[in-house]
Amino acid sequence: MNKSFTKKITKKNIFYIILICFILSVIPLYVIGMYAHPSVDDYYYGTETVQVWNETHSFASVVKCSFDEMINTYNIWQGNFSAIFLMRLQPGIFGEQYYFIAPLILLSAYIGFSIFFFYTALKKIFKADSYLAATVGICLTFVSMQLCTTPSDSFYWYNGAIYYTFFYSLMLFLFALLIRMRTAKAAGTIILTAISSVSAFLIGGSNYAAALFMCIILALSAGSAVYFVILRKNKVIRPYHMAAYIIVAAAAMAGLFISMAAPGNALRQQSVGGSTGIVKTFVYTFAFGGYSIAKVLNAPCLIFFICMIPVFYRIARRSGFTYRYPLLIAVFTFGLYCSMGTPVFYAQGLRMPYRMMNIIFFAAYVLITFNLIYFLGWIGNKFESKTYKQLIGGSTASYACGMQGYKFESKTFKQLIGGNTASNACSMQGYKYKKYSNEGDSHDENFYDKNFCDRDFRNKNAQKITADGITACEEPSMIKTDRACIILEKVIDCFFEKIKASRKNALLALAISLCAFIIACIGCIEVGETEYKSGDAGFGKLPLSAAATLSLINGDAKTYDCELTARDEYLRSTSDDEQFVTVPALSKRPAPIYHSDITDDPGDWHNAHVAMYYRKECIWTE
């Protein structure tokens, strides 16, 4: 490869290239969000607040109405207080033209908090450098968004997405703050505790998937902090850190307890039937956990993670962890991951909404990433150590060279196995050893003695090389033979150094991963008859950005926006005497912003929600 070109391939340049590509990929997602409109429960939960706004045009009155309705819902239907409060503030109540604020908030929250979480975790826990951590965070966020199963539920339908995607994103933000809190100073810990406690309390009052998962993580974090501070006397985690983790965990559990204690929960449970039972819930939980991971690991995603192995290996080796229990960690984290589905399986059986599936799929990327890093770290530790022992016939670097009275300095040994300098091992030019005397004193000695370059001198006291490894020299002053040097140079250099990809190669692997992912996505695209265009062909299984771009280019998004805007203006213009109204059906249903619409059946529950919103008896399509 051209050297001038190679010099330009730096971690900084690759980071900015991937960042620019990511920004370009999300531009269509924001643009098509300008054409989004309310759907289904947006109308139901906005019925009271839109009426208050139309009568008063007071934002404070709308907020008060939302709070009052939250209390009412808490008593008669469900206890997710923080989510219910936000649901009634959907932007469309202030005017249909303001609904674009919903996807703007939802997309920005997921993108920002997801990247921030991955960046913080990789940098603070695994000691990855800033550019690499940020680049990996961008790539993982990009892939999770492009392969989203039902993007309308996650980013463009306010009611469903604020309930699940937004609070899942807030949970990622909370976890990032908790990671940073571990090494924060006292003043910083106070600020982080305040922000984290409020976030944890609000998440506790949101959907039960995120609330339960968060409480388990926070309880484990608080317990770990107590263990390290009180029992281990850890100097990094201070007593004020321990207190902070306990406070945040208490806030989270308080929010969840208030939500679970709502009288409305029992009434709602009666409407859907009895609970599933513990045994069935347990089976459903783990069965769906396995299914969801298999669902996420489709061809594009699988290719992406395979191509990311060099990157994850570099991150794993940089951290310095021992990675001793890969199987235990995999089972434990899988159990945590599966807990997200437990509440809905217990309450409703297998009836899980797509918007909830989406956040479980998002969480799968976190699970796969950190387990893959841990497993690669275990592979590196296990097989590097084993190969060293086979090469040197012992367990220490000093025994490797047969220098029973000498010991390599760590830096020098790194140079010895690092590549080009290994070829100089025979002559020992510039290598230092630390010589230990009987009295325990030590001093550095440079070996430039001509005897070390003398082949006869070396061969005279050469050590034996067998298929199982290198035996120790009979005399402590003996140096390695030419053949031993070749083994060190060829095996260690070619094997380990190829696995231990340089920072440049790791970042190149990121770019290759994205290219392979895009190619795999293209291969998964289907062409067939659409659901709403009789006899007309369309594309299916498009990545999110491609689907949004196609809807913008072919005009479907614009047509959809015009038709729903005209419908809204017509319904607002009708008099109170007109209680039975028909409207034209939609001609376009553009992905990814279309969620659902009213039907030609006057008794359809979709129609009932829209009728309540516009204060009509019944609305249906022609």
Named regions from a protein language model:
Residues 6, 10-77, 91-133, 506-622:
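Intrinsically disordered, polar/acidic, low-complexity terminal segments
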Residues 190-217:
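Membrane-interface alpha helices of multi-pass inner-membrane proteins
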Residues 110-122, 170-182, 215-223, 305-309, ...:
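Transmembrane alpha-helical segments
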Residues 1-8, 124-125, 179-194, 223-239, ...:
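Membrane-interface junctions at the ends of membrane-embedded or membrane-associated helices
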Residues 141-147, 200-205, 251-260, 333-344, ...:
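Aromatic-anchored segments of alpha-helical transmembrane domains
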Residues 130-182, 207, 298, 338-373:
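Membrane-interface micro-motifs in multi-pass membrane enzymes
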Residues 330, 376-399, 404, 411-424, ...:
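Signature aromatic-anchored transmembrane alpha helix within multi-pass, membrane-resident enzymes
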Residues 28-105, 158-161, 208-364:
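Transmembrane catalytic cores of multi-pass membrane glycosyltransferases
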